[in-house]
Every structure is written in structure tokens, then in C-alpha cells.
Amino acid sequence: MGKIVKAVKKIINLTPGIKEASVSVYHKYSQLRYRKYVKKYPIDAHTVVFESYMGRKYSCSPRAMFEAMCEDSRYRDYKKVWAFTDPEKHRYLEKYPNTILVKYRSEDYYRYYARAGMWITNYLLDYGIEKRPGQIYVQTWHGTPLKKIGCDVPRLELSKKERERTCREYQREGQMIDFMPSPSPFYTEKVKSAFCLGPQARILEFGYPRNDDLFRYTEEKCENIKKELGIPADKKVILYAPTWRQSQHTAGEGFTYSLGIDFDKMKTRLGDKAVILFRTHYFISNSFDFSKYGGFIKDVSSYDEINDLYLISDLLITDYSSVFFDYANLERPILFYMYDYEAYREEMKDFYFGIELLPGPVIKEERDISEDVERLLEGFAVDDTYRRFNEIFNPHREVCGDRMVREIIREYR
């Protein structure tokens, strides 16, 4: 059955006009599923729906705010509903009182969205869902952007039809959002324009709940994470987290990723002293076989909470992913391996700022980087560029999820 569904999706994506028509039909179908529950149920102010990365993970700011609510007596009697593509994987969350798990885009999913007094998500809502008067929408997004997003994307990057669709999706979102957390004035400015935020939206600019774990971890927690992942205590940990490429897309399958890093050379130089954690973007559909490297490379792409990976890593290697904004809170070394920089700039057209602001060395050609990695592991110090970066992008470096939920109560309850 899975192969048949995959084949049908591929045909749809490869046939001009059919993809757009199928998306339109799906949107209408989703709206019908949602609206029947709107007609049937009143809003329950004491129900909150949480969703992270379209149901893929228990992570990011929705997780931080959920855990803050669980610790806040004012939310004790609230029903807390999590939407997951695989609810069985997350049954452990039912240990929290009044916590319910539903399958992403199931009937229960639309029913709880229609009834809930509050939604907390980090991605665009399912197109069938429309906010009712009296509901509260907290859109946390999923990181500070380097690449332009939403209505800020340059006209040259997308076709007219694609740009209109993108702007429509973000504008629709922006007219429903009531609250957005913000880690910086830079972030506030960009989400206002990218989402064309309406007058009802309030930006809470005192930190990013998704980073809470980075300010309250213990050595014991780090040791436990390493044990869980099978990482020897005496090895340095390198987190490699590249982003997706628009040009690496297979119709009917999704985005793929072609490795631009020479792991063979890295193992030769670093194999006896380090472990690499490989983390792809959640858009990436292809898998990787690192078995020939033994325990030197561990694929942690399916690991829910990236903060755990930040905490145990001695160095981050990335490219254009927003992970470096979060990781910089730890003031640890970052290497920007932008081996396809010129092609990527041509493809994406524009970033929100120049690479001269980045808090680490930038490599703009494909080559062996093991020596650069070794140098950073052995002799790193926070410099003026790194400090300036955090002043601009991470001025509020403290736990804020609990304050966020208090502000929402104060404003609306």
C-alpha cells in the first residue's frame, strides 16, 4: 500500500497542473473536516493544542511552553493535546496529567483544533484550520532566519504563482496570530514583515522558549544524553547540521541531501578523538548509511530534541541553517562550511544579512575541513565578532517559557 501511495504522489508531482489541483482539493477537504466540528462544538477555553514541525517531533518552543504549563498551577486543569504523525512514539507524554495524543490530520486532530481555546505551534497551520473568534493562536516559529522567508522572499526567486501562494500562506497565518515570542529586535522586525502580521498580533520580545534548555542544563544531563546515544565520555562531539537545498528535490519524494563533506578524511584525522552527530533538516527525505564508519558518525536526524545535541556538542558545523543562532547561546565554536556558497546564493537570492556577521570561520569551497575542525576544538576563544553576534541576535539569554505562559494568562485570562 505504501508503495502505491508513493507512486501516486510521484505521478501527481510530475504532471503539470495536477499538483496544484490536488492541493486545492485537499485544502477544501481539510476545511470541510474542520468546519463540521466548528458547527458542532463550542470553544473550550481550558484546552490547548500543541504541534511541532507538522507533528514530526516533541520539541522546540511548543515543548518548552507545554512543560512550563505543566509546572504552572494555573494550567493544572487544562486539557493539553499533542498532535503527532506517530502518536505511539510519544506515549510517554501521557504521564503528564490531562495530556492527550492525537494523530496529525486525523478526525481527532481537526476536532481538537476546532474546540481548543489556544493553539501553540512552530510551523504554518494546516490550511483547513481557521481561527474562531475567542481562540488564541501562539505561533512560535522554529528559529531565527538567515534566509528570507514568507513575504520577504525576493520576487526573482519564485515564479509569480509560487510567490503569490507563499505570500498568501504567510499572510493568512499573520492575520490569525495573537502571540509570537521573539529573541531579538532583529527577529521581531523580520517576522512582522515576513508574516504581514495583523494589528492583533503581540510580539513578546524577551527570549525564545526553544532555547530554555540551553540555560538550565547540568553535567549529569549531558552525561545521560551521551550514554543514551552511545558516545564515549572521552570523545569530543561534533554536531554537523546542514540545511536543505532547493535544487536537491525529487518529485513525489521530497528534498534530498547530497553529502558535501569528506567523512573519510575526517575519520582519518579525528577518528580516535571525536564523534560526529549528523543531523539533517526535517525536510530531507533520503536516509544515509554510515555503517562503514563504525561509531565515528551517528545519524541523529530522527532524535526529537536538538537542544540535547547542542548541549553535548563541543563544536557545530553548519551552513545556512538557523541552528547556529541557537547554538551561539552556548558560546562554543561554530564552523560554517558553505562549500556551495556561490550556487546557493544564486539559488536563494538573498539572506537577511551578510556572512561577515557570522560568529565563526566561513569556508566557501568544497575541501577537507578536518584541520579546521581540529584547530577549533583545540584553541577556541569567544572573540569580538562572536560577542557582537549575540548582542544583536541573542540579547535575552535566559529561561523564558514560564514567563511566556504567564504573559498569555495576564493578557487573556
Question: Across the structure, where does each feature detected by a protein language model lie?
Answer:
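Extended catalytic core of nucleotide-activated donor transferases of GT-like folds
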Residues: 63-67, 98-162, 168
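N-terminal pre-catalytic "stem/leader" segment of glycosyltransferase-like enzymes
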Residues: 2-107
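A donor-sugar binding/catalytic signature common to diverse glycosyltransferases
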Residues: 118-148, 303-348
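A nucleotide-sugar donor-handling region in carbohydrate enzymes
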Residues: 16-31, 150-250, 382-386
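Catalytic binding pocket for nucleotide-activated donors in carbohydrate/polymer assembly enzymes
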Residues: 291-295, 322-393
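Conserved catalytic-core segment of nucleotide-activated headgroup transferases in glycan assembly
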Residues: 59-67, 209-291, 363-365, 400
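A short beta-strand/loop micro-motif in the catalytic core of glycosyltransferases
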Residues: 119-120, 178-184, 276-277, 316-317
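Donor nucleotide-activated moiety binding/catalytic core segment of transferases
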Residues: 101-117, 277, 282-325
